[in-house]
Protein backbone atom coordinates (compact mmCIF):
# COMPACT_ATOMS: atom_id res chain seq x y z
CA UNK A 1 0.00 0.00 0.00
CA UNK A 2 2.73 2.48 0.91
CA UNK A 3 4.74 1.60 -2.21
CA UNK A 4 1.66 2.04 -4.42
CA UNK A 5 1.04 5.46 -2.86
CA UNK A 6 4.68 6.52 -3.00
CA UNK A 7 5.01 5.66 -6.68
CA UNK A 8 1.60 7.12 -7.50
CA UNK A 9 2.70 10.40 -5.93
CA UNK A 10 5.99 10.32 -7.83
CA UNK A 11 4.11 9.71 -11.09
CA UNK A 12 1.78 12.65 -10.40
CA UNK A 13 4.80 14.92 -9.90
CA UNK A 14 6.66 13.45 -12.89
CA UNK A 15 3.68 14.13 -15.17
CA UNK A 16 3.27 17.68 -13.80
CA UNK A 17 -0.12 16.94 -12.29
CA UNK A 18 0.95 18.07 -8.77
CA UNK A 19 3.79 20.05 -7.21
CA UNK A 20 6.38 18.32 -5.06
CA UNK A 21 5.44 20.57 -2.11
CA UNK A 22 1.84 19.34 -2.31
CA UNK A 23 3.00 15.74 -2.50
CA UNK A 24 5.16 16.23 0.61
CA UNK A 25 2.14 17.54 2.51
CA UNK A 26 -0.04 14.69 1.26
CA UNK A 27 2.56 12.12 2.32
CA UNK A 28 2.62 13.58 5.84
CA UNK A 29 -1.17 13.41 6.00
CA UNK A 30 -1.10 9.84 4.67
CA UNK A 31 1.20 8.78 7.51
CA UNK A 32 -1.30 10.26 10.01
CA UNK A 33 -4.15 8.31 8.41
CA UNK A 34 -2.14 5.08 8.40
CA UNK A 35 -1.31 5.58 12.09
CA UNK A 36 -5.05 5.94 12.82
CA UNK A 37 -5.73 2.62 11.10
CA UNK A 38 -8.17 4.00 8.55
CA UNK A 39 -7.25 1.53 5.81
CA UNK A 40 -9.79 2.69 3.25
CA UNK A 41 -8.62 6.28 3.52
CA UNK A 42 -5.01 5.31 2.67
CA UNK A 43 -4.81 7.14 -0.63
CA UNK A 44 -2.36 9.88 -1.52
CA UNK A 45 -4.52 10.67 -4.57
CA UNK A 46 -7.58 11.13 -2.37
CA UNK A 47 -5.68 13.46 -0.05
CA UNK A 48 -4.30 15.51 -2.95
CA UNK A 49 -7.65 15.71 -4.74
CA UNK A 50 -10.21 16.00 -1.97
CA UNK A 51 -8.44 17.33 1.13
CA UNK A 52 -5.78 19.56 -0.39
CA UNK A 53 -7.50 20.32 -3.72
CA UNK A 54 -4.05 20.15 -5.37
CA UNK A 55 -5.29 18.12 -8.34
CA UNK A 56 -8.63 17.12 -9.77
CA UNK A 57 -9.15 13.39 -10.04
CA UNK A 58 -10.74 14.01 -13.44
CA UNK A 59 -7.42 15.46 -14.65
CA UNK A 60 -5.59 12.31 -13.58
CA UNK A 61 -8.15 10.17 -15.43
CA UNK A 62 -7.88 12.39 -18.50
CA UNK A 63 -4.08 12.07 -18.42
CA UNK A 64 -4.44 8.27 -18.29
CA UNK A 65 -6.67 8.32 -21.38
CA UNK A 66 -4.86 11.00 -23.40
CA UNK A 67 -1.22 10.29 -22.60
CA UNK A 68 -1.19 6.59 -21.81
CA UNK A 69 -3.83 5.44 -24.27
CA UNK A 70 -5.87 3.71 -21.58
CA UNK A 71 -9.62 3.49 -21.37
CA UNK A 72 -11.99 4.73 -18.70
CA UNK A 73 -14.79 2.86 -16.94
CA UNK A 74 -17.42 3.33 -14.28
CA UNK A 75 -17.89 -0.10 -12.69
CA UNK A 76 -21.38 0.86 -11.49
CA UNK A 77 -22.52 0.43 -15.10
CA UNK A 78 -20.60 -2.73 -15.96
CA UNK A 79 -21.72 -6.25 -15.22
CA UNK A 80 -18.61 -7.94 -13.86
CA UNK A 81 -18.50 -11.67 -14.70
CA UNK A 82 -19.02 -14.00 -11.75
CA UNK A 83 -15.54 -15.54 -12.10
CA UNK A 84 -14.03 -12.15 -11.23
CA UNK A 85 -16.48 -11.46 -8.43
CA UNK A 86 -15.73 -14.75 -6.66
CA UNK A 87 -11.95 -14.76 -6.92
CA UNK A 88 -11.35 -11.16 -5.95
CA UNK A 89 -8.72 -10.39 -3.30
CA UNK A 90 -10.33 -7.31 -1.76
CA UNK A 91 -7.27 -6.57 0.38
CA UNK A 92 -5.07 -6.30 -2.70
CA UNK A 93 -7.74 -4.29 -4.48
CA UNK A 94 -7.98 -1.77 -1.62
CA UNK A 95 -4.17 -1.56 -1.36
CA UNK A 96 -3.78 -0.86 -5.08
CA UNK A 97 -7.08 0.96 -5.72
CA UNK A 98 -7.59 -1.45 -8.62
CA UNK A 99 -10.05 -4.19 -9.58
CA UNK A 100 -9.65 -6.88 -12.25
CA UNK A 101 -13.08 -6.92 -13.83
CA UNK A 102 -13.07 -8.96 -17.02
CA UNK A 103 -11.07 -10.97 -19.51
CA UNK A 104 -11.39 -11.20 -23.27
CA UNK A 105 -9.26 -13.82 -24.97
CA UNK A 106 -5.80 -13.42 -23.40
CA UNK A 107 -6.33 -9.87 -22.12
CA UNK A 108 -7.27 -9.01 -18.53
CA UNK A 109 -9.19 -5.79 -17.91
CA UNK A 110 -8.21 -3.90 -14.76
CA UNK A 111 -9.99 -0.78 -13.52
CA UNK A 112 -7.71 1.42 -11.45
CA UNK A 113 -7.58 4.84 -9.86
CA UNK A 114 -3.83 4.17 -9.49
CA UNK A 115 -2.94 3.12 -13.04
CA UNK A 116 -0.09 5.67 -13.08
CA UNK A 117 1.69 3.83 -10.25
CA UNK A 118 4.39 1.45 -11.52
CA UNK A 119 4.05 -0.57 -8.29
CA UNK A 120 0.36 -1.15 -9.00
CA UNK A 121 1.04 -2.12 -12.60
CA UNK A 122 3.77 -4.55 -11.59
CA UNK A 123 1.65 -6.11 -8.83
CA UNK A 124 -1.25 -6.91 -11.16
CA UNK A 125 1.06 -8.05 -13.97
CA UNK A 126 2.50 -10.68 -11.62
CA UNK A 127 -0.94 -11.71 -10.32
CA UNK A 128 -2.73 -12.09 -13.63
CA UNK A 129 -1.78 -14.52 -16.36
CA UNK A 130 -1.62 -12.51 -19.56
CA UNK A 131 -1.45 -8.93 -20.79
CA UNK A 132 -3.49 -6.21 -19.08
CA UNK A 133 -5.66 -3.49 -20.56
CA UNK A 134 -5.83 -0.64 -18.03
CA UNK A 135 -9.00 1.35 -17.49
CA UNK A 136 -8.93 4.50 -15.40
CA UNK A 137 -11.67 4.96 -12.85
CA UNK A 138 -12.34 7.09 -9.80
CA UNK A 139 -11.48 6.33 -6.20
CA UNK A 140 -15.21 6.47 -5.52
CA UNK A 141 -15.86 3.92 -8.27
CA UNK A 142 -13.36 1.48 -6.76
CA UNK A 143 -14.67 2.07 -3.22
CA UNK A 144 -18.30 1.60 -4.30
CA UNK A 145 -17.50 -1.59 -6.18
CA UNK A 146 -15.45 -3.11 -3.35
CA UNK A 147 -17.96 -2.03 -0.71
CA UNK A 148 -20.80 -3.67 -2.65
CA UNK A 149 -18.69 -6.77 -3.26
CA UNK A 150 -17.89 -7.10 0.44
CA UNK A 151 -21.55 -6.57 1.40
CA UNK A 152 -22.66 -9.20 -1.11
CA UNK A 153 -20.02 -11.64 0.20
CA UNK A 154 -21.24 -11.20 3.77
CA UNK A 155 -24.86 -11.65 2.66
CA UNK A 156 -23.95 -14.83 0.75
CA UNK A 157 -22.17 -16.28 3.81
CA UNK A 158 -25.07 -15.54 6.16
CA UNK A 159 -27.69 -16.96 3.79
CA UNK A 160 -25.97 -20.34 3.45
Question: Each predicted region: which residue ranges?
Answer:
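Non-catalytic accessory regions
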Residues: 1-151
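Cytosolic regulatory modules rich in charged/polar residues
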Residues: 152-160
Amino acid sequence: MMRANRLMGAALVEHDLVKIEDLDGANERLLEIVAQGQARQNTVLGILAYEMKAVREEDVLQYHVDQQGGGAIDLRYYEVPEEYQKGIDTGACWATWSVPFDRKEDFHFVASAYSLSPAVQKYWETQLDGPILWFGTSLEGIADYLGKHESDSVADKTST
